[in-house]
Structures are given as structure tokens and as C-alpha cells.
Swiss-Prot record:
Compartments it resides in: Mitochondrion
Listed GO CC annotations: mitochondrion
One Pfam match: LIAS_N
Residues holding [4Fe-4S] cluster 2: C136, C140, C143
Swiss-Prot/TrEMBL catalytic activity: [[Fe-S] cluster scaffold protein carrying a second [4Fe-4S](2+) cluster] + N(6)-octanoyl-L-lysyl-[protein] + 2 oxidized [2Fe-2S]-[ferredoxin] + 2 S-adenosyl-L-methionine + 4 H(+) = [[Fe-S] cluster scaffold protein] + N(6)-[(R)-dihydrolipoyl]-L-lysyl-[protein] + 4 Fe(3+) + 2 hydrogen sulfide + 2 5'-deoxyadenosine + 2 L-methionine + 2 reduced [2Fe-2S]-[ferredoxin]
Protein name: Lipoyl synthase, mitochondrial
Keywords recorded for this protein, A-Z: 4Fe-4S, Iron, Iron-sulfur, Metal-binding, Mitochondrion, S-adenosyl-L-methionine, Transferase, Transit peptide
InterPro entries per record: Aldolase_TIM, Elp3/MiaA/NifB-like_rSAM, LIAS_N, Lipoyl_synth, rSAM
């Protein structure tokens, strides 16, 4: 019978044995507990931890990448105009590069500064609408936009919806961009052009900037957009020629981008524009060479901004460029003859400060531009960069 009870009785777990051991009085157990209690009493307390000064840098995990400087940190966007634009976009099913690319200036450009009324925000707001969906056929190593070889088909109502939304906001300047659509025969050029024409029909007073891809090098498709009635044609070279194969999708080349900008100007566009990211491994000599190439083809506007890694799946930041270096590139570019230069850590290709200046040129200098041309205005305009009358 005792044997049967032993079989039926569940075995004691190690934890139970451990408790039993501690519960059994013994000189060795008491000694261990006493030493442990003494260590707790004589050791550092909570006050000792929180009274110490916090070090400037706490090492956690991978520290190979440079630390984000304080001047690159931005506040959470808010405000009446910000909420209005966001609501309209959702209602019409439209996408913005501001959201898709996680732009740090979204609160600023959408009129989300604290204290701004809806009317004040709208008058200062600039939104960058992303056409042809939110999925790109290319995979640049710096970009956070979704990618696919077979994105969804185009929305035939998008040109009308976009024009309706823009005319409703009462903005003075709008930027249209798009994902790359290498799956389409025309790269989406006709869709892009139709959107511009509808905007100009519904709100002819609005100035339109088109930030396009390279249309796989097809200059005929560049012409379709360039001759649609837009005011500014933008195409970003993104980085210097030497780094282009490592930064951009393999189908994009530096020389191909130059041809796009050059052809847009030859097609009759008043102002051409491009953007360069700093902090991806470029040298000063390479940046200067890129600027000279841009001036050879009469590009009017250039912007400089800091590359910021969207996720850990994207290429690392090589370095964070100091604001003083951005100021230096602004001066260098102006001396090379660019009509306008926006340069700063948080500047992006469609940053509103540059648009205010371009809007002033296109509106206030319309007659002069018609008679003289952009290149002849460069000298007189540079003197008034800090005092713009809208």
C-alpha cells in the first residue's frame, strides 16, 4: 500500500524543494539570509541612483550611427488648418508625400503653427499631393514610400478630385508629385498633365509646381507634363553623381535626371528646380561639381536638406551636417547664379519658404519675366530675398 501511495503522489517540483529547504531551520540557511539582508541594507538605495547626474549619452544597443542632433527634432503637428487639410485629403482619398515620406515639416507647411487660425493657416499652407497612388515601382534606398512591381491601377477620378480639393482650400501655391509608375506605358505623364489642366481650369490663380520622376528617360513624356500649363517643373537629382547608384534605384541615373531638367526648360517652363540631400557620404568637391552641372542646363532653384533615415531597412546616415555648412552651400549656390536657394537641415524639395519666393517671382514679376526672362532677373531678385512682398 505505501508503494502505491508513492506512485500516485505527484512528484515535488524543484521550486517546492527550494521553498522547503528555506523553510527548514539550519545554521547555513540563516547565515545566507543574514548576509543577503546585510548586503541590501548597506548597498546603494533608490536615492543614490536618482541623485546621480544623467550622462549626456546613454549607450543602448548599436551606436555605430551618428546621434540625432537637437536641431533636427520637431514638434507634433497640429492646428486648425492642419486638421482641415488632413480631413479633406481623407474624404477625397488623396495621398500626400508629406505623410507618405514622413516629412518633418508637415506641421509647418500645412499651417499647423500653434495659435494660427484656420484662415491664417490656409493662406500660408502648402500641401504636396502625391498622384497615381501610394505605391512606387522603384526602390530608392532613402525613400519610405511603399514599393511594388505591380501597383494598383490609376484612379480615373483622381485628377478631378485633386483639382476639387485644391480649389476648395484656397491655396496660392500647390506642389504635385507622384510615385514612379514604370508599369505604365507613358509613366503616368498624361494622368499628371490632366491633373494640372483641371486645377488650372477650376482655380487659374493657383501656381502649380510639378515634381516628377524621370519617366524612364522619355523626353516625350517630360514634354507632356512640361507643356500642361504648370509654373514650375521640379525633378530631384537627390545626390551627387558618384553616389547615385548607391542611393537611388538602379533605373535612375544622374545624367538622365539632368536631361529631364534640361528638356523641361527647353519645352518652355519658366522655372526648373531640383534638390540635393546631404549626409549620405558626399564630398564637398562632388557637391560643387553637381551644382555646376545644374547651372550648365539653366536650373533656377536648388534646395539642400539633411538625409534622415526613415527606418532601419533604409541606408544609414553617414553624418549629420551642421547648420553652418548648409549656410555655406546656400552662399556657394547663389554665387553660381541660382535664382533661389533654400538650404537647411530640415529643408525638403517642396519646403514652403522657397515657394513663397518663387510665387513672388511668378506673380509680382510676370511682366518683367515676359520681357526679360529668368536669367536676366537673377541679379535684381537676389537683393530682395529677405524682404518678399506676397
Amino acid at each position: 500500500m505505501p508503494t502505491l501511495l508513492r506512485i500516485l503522489r505527484p512528484p515535488r517540483s524543484p521550486f517546492t524543494r527550494c521553498l522547503a529547504t528555506f523553510a527548514t531551520p539550519s545554521s547555513s540557511g540563516s547565515s545566507s539570509r543574514s548576509k543577503f539582508t546585510e548586503s541590501l541594507e548597506t548597498g546603494p538605495g533608490l536615492d543614490d541612483f536618482i541623485s546621480e547626474e544623467v550622462p549626456d549619452r546613454v549607450v543602448l544597443g548599436n551606436t555605430k550611427g551618428p546621434r540625432l542632433p537637437s536641431y533636427l527634432k520637431t514638434s507634433i503637428p497640429s492646428g486648425a488648418s492642419f486638421n482641415k487639410i488632413k480631413k479633406d485629403l481623407r474624404g477625397l482619398g488623396l495621398h500626400t508625400v508629406c505623410e507618405e515620406a514622413r516629412c518633418p515639416n508637415i506641421g509647418d507647411c500645412w499651417g499647423g503653427k500653434p495659435g494660427a487660425t484656420e484662415a491664417e493657416g490656409r493662406s500660408a499652407a502648402t500641401a504636396t499631393i502625391m498622384l497615381m497612388g501610394d505605391t512606387c515601382t522603384r526602390g530608392c534606398r532613402f525613400c519610405s514610400v511603399k514599393t511594388s512591381r505591380t501597383p494598383p491601377p490609376l484612379d480615373p477620378h483622381e485628377p478631378e478630385n485633386t483639382a476639387e480639393a485644391i480649389s476648395r482650400w484656397g491655396l496660392g501655391y500647390i506642389v504635385l508629385t507622384s510615385v514612379d509608375r514604370d508599369d505604365l506605358l507613358d509613366g503616368g505623364a498624361h494622368h499628371f498633365a490632366e491633373t494640372i489642366r483641371k486645377i488650372k481650369y477650376k482655380a487659374p490663380q493657383i501656381l502649380v509646381e510639378a515634381l516628377t520622376g524621370d519617366f524612364a528617360g522619355s523626353l516625350d513624356h517630360v514634354s507632356i507634363v512640361a507643356q500642361s500649363g504648370l509654373d514650375v517643373y521640379a525633378h530631384n537629382i537627390e545626390t551627387v553623381e558618384e553616389l547615385t547608384p548607391f542611393v537611388r534605384d538602379r533605373r535612375a541615373t544622374f545624367r538622365q535626371s539632368l536631361k529631364v531638367l534640361e528638356h523641361a526648360k527647353k519645352s518652355g517652363v519658366r522655372i526648373t528646380k531640383t534638390s540635393i540631400m546631404l549626409g549620405v557620404g558626399e564630398t564637398k568637391e562632388q557637391v560643387l561639381a553637381a551644382l555646376k552641372e545644374l547651372r550648365k542646363i539653366d536650373v533656377d532653384v536648388v534646395t539642400f536638406g539633411q538625409y534622415m533615415r526613415p527606418t532601419k531597412r533604409h541606408m544609414k546616415v553617414d553624418r549629420y551636417v551642421e547648420p553652418a555648412e548648409f549656410d555655406n552651400w546656400k552662399e556657394v549656390a547663389e554665387n553660381l547664379g541660382f535664382l533661389y536657394v533654400a538650404s537647411g537641415p530640415l529643408v525638403r524639395s517642396s519646403y514652403k519658404a522657397g515657394e513663397f519666393y518663387i510665387e513672388n517671382v511668378l506673380r509680382g514679376k510676370n511682366k518683367a519675366i515676359g520681357g526679360l526672362g529668368i536669367s536676366q532677373l537673377e541679379g535684381s531678385e537676389k537683393g530682395s530675398m529677405t524682404g518678399i512682398d506676397r
